[in-house]
Amino acid sequence: MNSGFYLHESLVFFLLTVFALAFILGIFLGKPVIRWLKKRNHYDQVQKEYCEKLEVLHQDKKYTPTAGGILFFIVLLLTIFFWLPLGKLSTWLFAFLIISWSSLGWYDDIVKKRKKKGHGISAKQKFVLQLLISAVITTAVMYIYKGTSLFYTLRVPFFGSVSLGHSVLGQVFYFILAVLAIVGTGNAVNLTDGLDGLAAGTTCMCAFGLLVVAVTSTTIPLATDIPVLLTALLGVSLAFLKYNCSPAQVFMGDTGSLLIGGVLGSCAVMLRAELLLILLGGVFVAEAGSVILQIASCRFRKKRIFLCSPLHHHYEYKGVSETQVVKRFWTAGFFCMVFGIIAALWR
């Protein structure tokens, strides 16, 4: 990619071009992907035996194809190879995170398809693989940033950069934080993907928030490349909503949700915005937090906090329609995005 594209006056035009191509490609490839998934009988097999009411509410979703996240995989991979130079380490780092996260999700979707009750690989297996992928990405980022001031700092919302010190202990702390940020985001998006359009719409807002952080972080080594990946994610997410809004023609499955979470978490690590992601992705945090609290409460108190978890199912259980739940969560996601951007730009 010609570095001239990143002159200040042409940045917006360039990113709009990236967005437009990703969006058009997503719209164009959407129907062929859905047809292909139907031919391979990639339908949602997961049974909600933990909640009979949800089983009834989602009865009409049984014959909706899943693993539509392959659309994200295709568009994101084509985007980075089209716009970024093959000789740059960042290009191959992006390719690795796209391929690895989508492959893990695809494998999980395949296992779900083959099992009678639609359960994928075990939580332990998935967690170990997520840790390995995230560790590789974090190691690569730390290698790229070694020797720069960013190697020793952490961005804290409203307070700016905070020094981690030059000790090995500080770097070990950051490594653990970064790995957990990527793994946590992957799982949080995965948990959010339970209603038509919910995860894709929330992704648009979180990706836009991180994009603002990226284009204003001129001192970060990867700041010229990260916007390309985030803009492409924003474009394909909006395109996917055409097929995923209620009534959904396709679900993203783990192929899409883990890939999206992996991209958002990895970009946050590259931008040193791990803590900021908690604000920008507040809906994802709330969804994951509701599951953690529910499990902890059932284990130690023998009581449920929510009628059903993740949080969006709690509201469904209370009688709120699916479309209303999605609209409210999108609204919450918008305010989280605005608050996160303010926190990022606060000096």
Curated annotation (Swiss-Prot):
* GO BP of this protein: cell division; cell wall organization; peptidoglycan biosynthetic process; regulation of cell shape
The record's section on PROSITE patterns has: MRAY_1, MRAY_2
Which transformation does this protein catalyse, written as a reaction? UDP-N-acetyl-alpha-D-muramoyl-L-alanyl-gamma-D-glutamyl-meso-2,6-diaminopimeloyl-D-alanyl-D-alanine + di-trans,octa-cis-undecaprenyl phosphate = di-trans,octa-cis-undecaprenyl diphospho-N-acetyl-alpha-D-muramoyl-L-alanyl-D-glutamyl-meso-2,6-diaminopimeloyl-D-alanyl-D-alanine + UMP
Which EC numbers does the record give?
Answer: 2.7.8.13
Q: What's this protein's family per the entry?
A: Belongs to the glycosyltransferase 4 family. MraY subfamily.
Task: State the taxonomy lineage.
Answer: Bacteria, Pseudomonadati, Chlamydiota, Chlamydiia, Chlamydiales
Organism of origin: Chlamydia abortus (strain DSM 27085 / S26/3)
Q: Which cofactor does it need?
A: Mg(2+)
* Pathway of action: Cell wall biogenesis; peptidoglycan biosynthesis
Entries under CDD domains matching the protein: GT_MraY
Q: Which GO terms describe its molecular function?
A: metal ion binding; phospho-N-acetylmuramoyl-pentapeptide-transferase activity; UDP-N-acetylmuramoyl-L-alanyl-D-glutamyl-meso-2,6-diaminopimelyl-D-alanyl-D-alanine:undecaprenyl-phosphate transferase activity
Q: Is Metal-binding tagged as a keyword?
A: yes
Q: What does this protein do?
A: Catalyzes the initial step of the lipid cycle reactions in the biosynthesis of the cell wall peptidoglycan: transfers peptidoglycan precursor phospho-MurNAc-pentapeptide from UDP-MurNAc-pentapeptide onto the lipid carrier undecaprenyl phosphate, yielding undecaprenyl-pyrophosphoryl-MurNAc-pentapeptide, known as lipid I.
SS bonds (residue pairs): none
Can you say where in the cell this protein is located? Cell inner membrane
Q: What is its main location?
A: membrane
Q: Which NCBIfam families match?
A: mraY
Q: Which GO cellular component term is one of those annotated?
A: plasma membrane
Out of the domains of life, which is the source? Bacteria
Q: What is the protein's given name?
A: Phospho-N-acetylmuramoyl-pentapeptide-transferase
Q: How does it sit in the membrane?
A: Multi-pass membrane protein
Check the record and name the Pfam families matching this protein: Glycos_transf_4
Transmembrane residue ranges: 10-30, 67-87, 91-111, 127-147, 164-184, 195-215, 220-240, 250-270, 275-295, 325-345
Q: Which UniProt keywords apply?
A: Cell cycle, Cell division, Cell inner membrane, Cell membrane, Cell shape, Cell wall biogenesis/degradation, Magnesium, Membrane, Metal-binding, Peptidoglycan synthesis, Transferase, Transmembrane, Transmembrane helix
